[in-house]
UniProtKB/Swiss-Prot annotation:
A GO cellular component annotation in the UniProt record: plasma membrane
Compartments where located: Cell membrane
Oligomeric form and interacting partners: F-type ATPases have 2 components, CF(1) - the catalytic core - and CF(0) - the membrane proton channel. CF(1) has five subunits: alpha(3), beta(3), gamma(1), delta(1), epsilon(1). CF(0) has three main subunits: a, b and c.
Recorded topology in the membrane: Peripheral membrane protein
PANTHER family: ATP SYNTHASE GAMMA CHAIN, ATP SYNTHASE SUBUNIT GAMMA, MITOCHONDRIAL
Record gene name: atpG
GO biological process: one example: proton motive force-driven plasma membrane ATP synthesis
UniProt name for this protein: ATP synthase gamma chain
Length: 304
């Protein structure tokens, strides 16, 4: 019985130590998520406006750019998977990987070979363990991505897409490095309690032609539409990648805050249950000791 009591007290101490760690992680995530949300909210208007500008340019001008033209027989599709660098964030990464696998299956059904690009150590470890060929990876900034990180990633993706569009000097030589489509898998932040894993195509761009109810607005482009489009295009793709990483960063912190709060609450419940069991064991031990003392006293009295 004493051994059981010592074991219960040891488990209570262990649960208390774990609770301190999870509580600290919860507080850290809570303090960081406000900054992540602020960065996300400040970036969204710019991303929306540049998307609207490029859509207007493409819809109002006869542009023939590789990023607007569908490949006649797409064979390779680049997929950028945005994950986290650290764990302890619930099902955040598992949901990203599940959505990625769904996209890979869809691409294969369409006769396209997925070409994998990853952001975050978790995705790098996940796909390396499964012997995936990773075209390129970026790590170390999942919680606090910078615009420079997004620019580097977007540049790599655009270079691969341009090779697939026949912009390279030797298309046959560069075939293994080229892609005909660009997709991104990330986690969209909706609120502290709601995030959804999304898979979206970045290139070729999908131009939406919207019918105007009133008189049609005529635009005059200075410089010409093609020059303006090519000037804005790198910023557009970088902004798309940057916005996705900001969404994922806020989602990661929200998932970690929820996961750590749940772990802290579970530790509290476990400590209460173990404390109750320990008290019962202690009470039983005391009762047994009293019974032994009374029994010994009665035996001495009978002996007299």
């Amino acid at each position: 019985m004493a051994a059981t009591l010592r074991e219960l007290r040891g488990r209570i101490r262990s649960a208390g130590s774990i609770k301190k760690i999870t509580k600290a992680q919860e507080l850290i995530a809570t303090s960081r998520i406000a900054r992540a949300q602020a960065r996300l909210e400040s970036a969204r208007p710019y991303a929306d406006q540049i998307t609207q500008m490029l859509t207007t340019l493409a819809a109002d001008a006869a542009l023939d750019h590789p990023l607007l033209v569908e490949h006649p027989q797409p064979k390779r599709a680049g997929v950028l998977v945005v994950s986290s660098d650290r764990g302890l964030c619930g099902a955040y990464n598992a949901n990203v990987f599940r959505r990625s696998e769904e996209l890979f299956s869809l691409l294969r059904d369409e006769g396209k070979q997925p070409v994998l690009y990853v952001v975050g150590r978790k995705a790098l470890a996940y796909y390396t363990f499964r012997n995936w060929d990773i075209a390129q990876s970026w790590t170390g900034f999942s919680e606090q991505p910078k615009y420079e990180n997004a620019a580097e990633i977007a540049s790599t993706l655009v270079d691969a897409f341009m090779l697939g569009a026949g912009e390279g000097e030797d298309q046959q030589t560069n075939n293994e490095q080229s892609v005909d489509e660009l997709h991104i898998v990330f986690t969209e932040f909706k609120s502290m309690l709601s995030q959804s894993t999304e898979a979206r195509r970045m290139a070729p761009m999908v131009v939406e032609y919207v019918e105007e109810t009133g008189p049609r607005t005529l635009y005059s482009f200075e410089p010409d539409a093609t020059t303006l489009f090519e000037s804005l295009l790198p910023r557009y793709l970088t902004t798309r990648v940057y916005a996705a990483m900001l969404e994922s960063a806020a989602s990661e912190l929200a998932s970690r805050q929820r996961a750590m709060k749940s772990a802290t609450d579970n530790a509290d419940d476990l400590i209460k249950a173990l404390t109750l069991m320990a008290n019962r064991e202690r009470q039983a031990q005391i009762t047994q000791e009293i019974s032994e003392i009374v029994g010994g006293a009665n035996a001495l009295a009978d002996a007299r």
